Regions:
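Membrane-helix and juxtamembrane interface regions of eukaryotic multi-pass membrane proteins
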Residues: 1-86, 90-108
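Single conserved hydrophobic/aromatic residue that forms the stacking wall/gate
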Residues: 122-130
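Functionally constrained cores in energy, signaling, and assembly domains
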Residues: 94, 114, 129
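Hydrophobic alpha-helical transmembrane segments in multi-pass integral membrane proteins
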Residues: 114-123
């Protein structure tokens, strides 16, 4: 079994565990914010921080493979980057987040989740219409 398949199966197993655990634990985010989940940061900072790997890391990873991408792969990459530039750097400043906070643990969890997502997407990008 390839490393990619092991990674995929592991990621699916983690998703199943988290899916069922969220029936018993309410993530302290938004209206469910509560004490006991560590220090809070501003919601805007937390959002930009947790979504930033989707832009920054993808640009770093894509820089090494840009010349080998075909037109369709380049379009998918451009769509990804357009979506996440908006989601990361534009949307948080258009919505009213004044005075709202989120636990740093949630922002860190999402940050690492997005690192995995970007890495996985980057690994599969060359297989799209290759």
């Amino acid at each position: 079994m390839s490393s990619f398949n092991i990674f995929s199966i592991t990621w699916i197993a983690i998703a199943v565990v988290i899916f069922f655990s969220l029936f018993y634990v309410v993530a302290p985010y938004g209206r469910h914010l509560k004490e006991g989940w560590g220090p809070n940061v501003s919601a805007r900072f937390g959002w930009v921080f947790m979504e930033s790997p989707c832009v920054v890391l993808m640009l770093i990873l894509a820089a090494g493979t840009w010349e080998s991408l075909n037109l369709v792969q380049g379009i998918f990459l451009a769509l990804w980057l357009t979506h996440y530039v908006h989601r990361t750097f534009i949307w948080p400043y258009r919505v009213n987040m004044s005075g709202k906070e989120m636990p740093l643990t949630i922002a860190l969890s999402a940050f690492f989740f997005n690192i995995i997502t970007v890495s996985y997407t980057h690994l599969t990008l060359p297989t799209i219409y290759s």
